[in-house]
Amino acid sequence: MKKQRAFLKWAGGKYSLVEDIQRHLPEARELVEPFVGAGSVFLNTDFERYLLADINPDLINFYNLLKTEPQAYIHEAKRWFVPENNRKEVYLDIRKQFNQSDDAMFRSLAFLYMNRFGFNGLCRYNKKGGFNVPFGSYKKPYFPEQELEFFAEKAQRATFICASYGETFARAQSDSVIYCDPPYAPLSTTANFTSYAGNGFTLDDQAALADIAEKTAKERGISVLISNHDTTHTRRLYRGAQLNVVKANRTISRNGAGRNKVDELLALFTPHLSSQA
């Protein structure tokens, strides 16, 4: 199976870790992802069914539209990727229209445009829910036609829902396995990116996720794999899991003083391990 890239640029995307995640995911008929993001794990695994969730309604509405109207969407989206749209004033006008519109097709077209023409592929909202990523000033933003087509075809096996991780866990079935890619625990007090979908993911949220993962394995017999930074705090949270350290290819900037690769944890909660805890 050829490795497949997501069509969205995405902070914390799992493309570089797909092989490690595949290796540690137990076999099941359904993969459940409460934090689907750009979908790299979905795109590079082969389960019969997928339940893919995110708290960002723009993302989920986009995925559902691409699933049901792929040709119409791709045809229209391609028309946005022209040199005259690669200007700051055009970008800011489209961003303004996006924040005022409730039309599903327009919002999905603008979402892809802003992902590719905006700064660094960020997805960020202000406290009022307005998308606020600045213009990216890229020479020629790439139109991901093949990636969109692949996603749309594979999406026929998937159900996309806008839901919290707790709601998504509740919908997992006995033949499911759950993979969680939450907003990562900070390496330092200044390193956290908390404006995704207008909500921060706190240390209390990290603890609650670890708790529900352990309970789901122990009480419902469903295995849960979580990825996160390898820190003293995350090791404490995942002490009831099998811990595997992987080397991430992505880099984390530390106060602008150079970039450092970081270790990541893959924590696997299984019914067997949880019953021994």
UniProtKB/Swiss-Prot annotation:
The keyword Zinc does not apply. It is an enzyme of class 2 (transferase). Its EC number is 2.1.1.72. Pfam families: MethyltransfD12. InterPro entries: Ade_MeTrfase_dom_2 (IPR023095), DNA_methylase_N6_adenine_CS (IPR002052), M_m6A_EcoRV (IPR012263), MeTrfase_D12 (IPR012327), SAM-dependent_MTases_sf (IPR029063). Keywords: DNA replication, DNA-binding, Methyltransferase, S-adenosyl-L-methionine, Transferase. SUPFAM superfamilies: S-adenosyl-L-methionine-dependent methyltransferases. Belongs to the N(4)/N(6)-methyltransferase family. This is DNA adenine methylase.
